[in-house]
């Protein structure tokens, strides 16, 4: 269902705003959690869509909305906010929410983008990388609280600082 507004997807394409996708995302984030409501997250978000709003911006609004609903009486919203943040991270990193790449494929991709140093191949054999991949259980990502996942994202994920605009206030020479 669209209201005539278009959204800009993370890959740069433009498509009509689909409110059902927002609802489905909230439903999935609330799945299996007691005392939470996808509709409440949507209502709390008060999304004021405008033509050309990015899907990343919509996701951030939903994350803040769920985060704002965390209270002593409604603690499970911390998991709703965490899941919404996790969906955002996965979409940004891999372009999808499910069917995540193997550790080997992730390393190859990061080396090709010059995020990782190629020296990683001299430190770990392919066998070791594949063995490590066998220990990764992505379903455990859903055990993070919002505060925990936010800290991992903000402090420990590799950030592309070239995308951050840093400006220093103009200083006037003292005479």
What are these regions (language model features)?
Residues 164-175:
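Single conserved hydrophobic/aromatic residue that forms the stacking wall/gate
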Residues 1-19, 23-162:
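Often metal-dependent polyanion-binding catalytic scaffolds in large enzymes
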């Amino acid at each position: 269902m669209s209201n005539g507004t278009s959204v800009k997807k993370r890959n740069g394409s433009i498509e009509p705003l689909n409110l059902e996708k927002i609802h489905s995302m909230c439903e999935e984030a609330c799945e299996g959690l007691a005392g939470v409501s996808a509709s409440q997250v949507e209502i709390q978000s008060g999304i004021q869509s405008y033509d050309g709003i990015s899907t990343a911006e919509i996701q951030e609004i939903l994350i803040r909305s769920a985060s704002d609903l965390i209270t002593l009486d409604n603690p499970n919203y911390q998991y709703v906010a965490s899941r919404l943040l996790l969906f955002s991270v996965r979409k940004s990193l891999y372009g999808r929410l499910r069917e995540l790449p193997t550790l080997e494929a992730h390393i190859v991709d990061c080396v090709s983008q010059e995020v990782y140093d190629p020296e990683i191949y001299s430190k770990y054999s392919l066998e070791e990388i594949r063995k490590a991949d066998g220990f990764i259980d992505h379903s455990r990502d859903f055990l993070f609280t919002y505060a925990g996942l936010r800290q991992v994202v903000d402090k420990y994920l590799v950030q592309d600082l070239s995308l951050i605009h840093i400006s220093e206030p103009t200083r006037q020479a003292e005479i």
